[in-house]
């Protein structure tokens, strides 16, 4: 009995389970180069080795947008001026061997990026206003973690043994080891049916990347059984959890300086606290009022507001899934798929820990501060606060934050306190907070998919439902702003509202909630055949959507109602508003067109291609797919020679969605050359 399948013959990167990056390029499956084949023991053992070596470059062609410069997201932007940002040497090799009904498959890869490993970056050229990076004090270098993840690496990807048997006239196949799953039908958008394998964004960004290098294999036992000629069942159990590797801090496409590899410190610019920097150092050294000490305010008003601690990883067990696929011959041999997966989050939410901080004696600090402040310092503090020196002196004796004066500030983040005592408490609290990446466990996914043909078109679609999807609540800067503006009350043992949660000393903040979520995808791959002067031409279109239910998507903050953060992570405290936050419904589409001219010259084939991506309505949650108004396109040309040598050049432009689009100034040109044997 033969297990039937209607899977499409085209692959795309990052394809199934991939990131929804606007610069996605189709990696078409052309004819494969002849691998090195071998056999032993009178052909009882056979196998092959398939190797690809490549060289690639990525060039920034758009200058830095000075408005794209948040202190906790801007390392990647400041690190690279226009010019070469990545130069990669890479090798990937596949080994497969089989004996009778059994076999083994191993894939390994290694790369080296000279721009990360051997060069200084351009941070100092762009350091205006002056801010520390995650590499401080060596701001023009990359962190050790970034160098390891994005600069060089060598690892085994897939590594599994497999077997094929007949059990009771039913064909059975099984795999044991590190493997990639290909469930569902979606191509360009994540959070669909195929959710088992994480994605390595550092690999995806490398010039010349391939989907087989981007999807992270997971350790699992899986099997497939042909129950009937038309019905099959597949199941797996995963015993080692792995996370998605987002762009490391300081790399060209990085979106966060905190919650990716290489992040260590959250900062805020608090110029109102500059006059208190020396006073804080002196009082904390003397142990006044329980001040813990630590990094103080630098001359530009930059202050540490949290340390980034080790991840809170999900457990290794408890991830499993089952799928049934049915070929309905009476419906034009349409394939239907039905899925269930229980998995742990691959992308993090924010966790903050206040448990190690014991608080302050603000009365003792106020007494010392009042005597220590010179008239010059008092004038500077009063000027920053916009009040008279007499008014400042009136509140110096008050150890708590004056709410009337606080409300008078036009920028709550950069004017967190209105008196010296509150300012000293703010500096101290910020030195003690620890934030971490938290990966939520036990997410359930129920899915349905179909795949059929209509004339020359392959038509596909899928629907996934998660009754308990974790999504972020507050934007990063709103969490930090809530902390800073209420630091004196918190230090005094009071209860404060941070990101909609009532917390006090000793508490933890889990910045997520669970909601019902539906994700849909509908698309087609159309083969035009010889058309418009091409020997072959095909197009791809995919429409995707996200729908959140079972929650109002808003929370009560310290100063009114806020909506949950959107995909752009724009904060209310930084001037973003309701239109920038999450919506219950969000939509986007991707279009691809590619043609081929065969044998243009002496065995050389040319394949021009174009990709257009548009998020046309609604904002996703923080780890979703869509930012309303965001657009991108890529145009390029691929040349291949005798199915072994390939070269490609492409141009990508990102635009739309205003300040929410963190990639809006990352236009680039990429080129690569590959040789397979």
Per-region residue spans from a language model:
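Outer-membrane beta-barrel "beta-signal"
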Residues: 665-677
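Transmembrane beta-strands of outer-membrane beta-barrel pores
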Residues: 55-61, 110-114, 118, 178-182, ...
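Solvent-exposed loop segments that connect transmembrane elements
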Residues: 62-79, 117-145, 197-206, 249-306, ...
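Detector for outer-membrane/organellar transmembrane beta-barrel domains
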Residues: 86, 341, 348, 460, ...
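Outer membrane beta-barrel
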Residues: 98, 102-262, 266, 588, ...
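Short loop/turn motifs that connect adjacent beta-strands in outer-membrane beta-barrel proteins
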Residues: 34-49, 60-64, 95-104, 162-174, ...
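Transmembrane beta-strands of outer-membrane beta-barrel proteins
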Residues: 47-55, 104-108, 172-174, 233-235, ...
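Membrane-embedded beta-strand positions in outer-membrane beta-barrel channels/transporters
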Residues: 48, 90-94, 158-160, 220, ...
């Amino acid at each position: 009995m033969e297990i039937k399948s209607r899977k499409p013959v085209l692959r795309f990167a990052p394809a199934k389970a991939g990131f929804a990056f606007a610069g996605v390029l189709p990696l078409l499956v052309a004819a494969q180069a002849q691998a090195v084949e071998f056999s032993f023991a009178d052909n009882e053992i056979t196998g092959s080795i398939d190797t690809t070596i490549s060289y690639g470059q990525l060039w920034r062609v758009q200058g830095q947008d000075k408005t794209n410069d948040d202190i906790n997201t801007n390392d990647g932007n400041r690190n690279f001026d226009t010019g070469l940002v990545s130069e990669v040497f890479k090798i990937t090799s596949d080994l497969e061997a089989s004996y009778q009904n059994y076999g083994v498959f191993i894939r390994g890869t290694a790369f080296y990026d000279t721009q990360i490993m051997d060069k200084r970056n351009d941070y100092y050229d762009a350091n205006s206003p002056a801010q520390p990076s995650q590499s401080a004090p060596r701001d023009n270098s990359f962190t050790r973690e970034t160098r390891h993840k994005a600069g060089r690496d060598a690892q085994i990807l897939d590594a599994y043994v497999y077997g094929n048997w007949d059990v009771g006239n039913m064909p059975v196949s099984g795999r044991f080891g590190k493997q990639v799953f290909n469930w569902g039908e979606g191509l360009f958008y994540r959070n669909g049916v195929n959710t088992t394998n994480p994605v390595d964004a550092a690999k995806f960004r490398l010039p010349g990347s391939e989907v087989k290098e981007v999807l992270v294999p997971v350790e699992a036992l899986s099997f497939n059984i042909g129950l009937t000629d038309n019905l099959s069942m597949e199941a797996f159990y995963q015993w080692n959890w792995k996370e998605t590797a987002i762009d490391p801090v300081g790399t060209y496409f990085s979106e966060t300086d905190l919650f990716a590899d290489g992040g260590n410190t959250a900062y805020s610019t608090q110029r109102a606290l500059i006059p208190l920097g020396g006073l804080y150092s002196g009082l904390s050294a003397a142990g006044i009022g329980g001040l813990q000490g630590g990094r103080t305010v630098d001359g530009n008003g930059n202050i540490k507001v949290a340390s980034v601690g080790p991840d809170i990883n999900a457990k290794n067990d408890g991830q499993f899934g089952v799928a049934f696929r049915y070929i309905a011959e009476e419906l034009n041999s349409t394939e239907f798929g039905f899925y269930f997966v229980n998995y742990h989050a691959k992308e993090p939410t924010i966790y903050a820990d206040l448990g190690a901080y014991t608080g302050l004696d603000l009365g003792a600090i106020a007494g010392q501060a009042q005597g220590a402040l010179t008239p010059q310092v008092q004038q500077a503090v009063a000027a920053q606060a916009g009040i008279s020196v007499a008014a400042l002196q009136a509140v110096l004796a008050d150890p708590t934050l004056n709410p009337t004066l606080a409300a008078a500030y036009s920028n709550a983040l950069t004017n967190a306190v209105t008196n010296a005592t509150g300012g000293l408490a703010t500096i101290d609290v910020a030195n003690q907070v620890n934030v971490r990446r938290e990966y939520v466990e036990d997410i359930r996914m129920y899915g349905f998919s179909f795949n059929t043909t209509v004339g020359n078109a392959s038509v596909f679609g899928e629907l996934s439902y998660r009754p308990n999807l974790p999504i972020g609540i507050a934007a990063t800067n709103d969490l930090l702003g809530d902390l800073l503006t209420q630091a004196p009350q918190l230090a005094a043992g009071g209860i404060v509202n941070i990101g909609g949660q009532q917390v006090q000393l000793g508490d933890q903040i889990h910045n997520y909630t669970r909601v019902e979520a539906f994700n849909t995808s509908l698309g087609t791959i159309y083969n035009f055949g010889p058309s418009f002067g091409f020997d072959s031409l095909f197009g791809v279109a995919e429409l995707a959507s996200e729908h959140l239910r079972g929650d109002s998507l808003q929370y009560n903050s310290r100063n009114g109602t806020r909506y949950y953060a959107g995909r752009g992570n724009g904060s209310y405290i930084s001037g973003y508003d309701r239109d920038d936050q999450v919506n219950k419904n969000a939509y986007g589409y991707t279009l691809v067109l590619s043609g081929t001219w065969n044998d243009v010259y002496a065995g050389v084939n040319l394949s021009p291609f174009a990709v257009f991506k548009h998020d046309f309505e609604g904002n996703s949650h923080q780890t979703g797919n869509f930012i309303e108004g965001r657009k991108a396109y890529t145009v390029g040309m691929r040349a291949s020679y005798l199915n072994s040598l390939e070269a490609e050049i492409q141009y990508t432009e990102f635009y739309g969605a205003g300040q929410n689009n963190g990639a809006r100034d990352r236009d680039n040109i990429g080129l690569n050359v590959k040789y397979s044997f």
